[in-house]
Amino acid sequence: MHLLPEIIESAPEIQDIRRNIHAHPELRFEENRTADLVAEALSSWGITVFRGMGKTGVVGRLDGELGPGKMIGLRADMDALPLQEHNNFAHASRNPGKMHACGHDGHTAMLLGAAQYLSNHRDFKGSVIFIFQPAEEGGAGAREMIKDGLFEQFPCDAVFGLHNWPGLAEGDFGVTAGPMMASSNTFEITVTGKGGHAALPH
């Protein structure tokens, strides 16, 4: 896979951001430090920042210099999991019982990398909306952002997200139209009948 020299050049900075987020994981709707980091980075690149959607969500808007056009959303999640990290590298979690075990630190850093690149290359029509979602892990953060008017304020023509996938070879991308990954849901059933032994159900 061919990477632009500018992307390679910015990789250490984006890696530092990822490690910073990894070392300070925050659970759903508690992503205040992460949201501050995201907002500060976007602002420093001249991207307009909107806070408060979905409680701790952050949205950045970048308008192209070639006039009106499509509005494209790029989305990443920011929350960590309630797990104890047992790694011993320098950027291991400093928050007991919290860990970025699903790669949202990477997702957030990658989207910031895309934002940084596009902020330096505004020769496009339309707008890019950078959506940093809280509470993906069982907190319905996307629903909360939508309830707070995300797509009324930013009527995107399309929204793209990604998830890291260690099973794919480095440099490969898996793409599909529509939903791709299953969600975990709970439900209850009631069975009416007589009790008995499993070996003698009759």
Give the predicted meaning of each segment.
Residues 1-100, 109-112, 116-124:
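Acidic/His- and Gly-rich active-site-bordering loop/insert found
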Residues 81-83, 87-99, 106, 124-202:
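Histidine/acidic-residue-rich, glycine-tolerant segments that coordinate divalent metal ions
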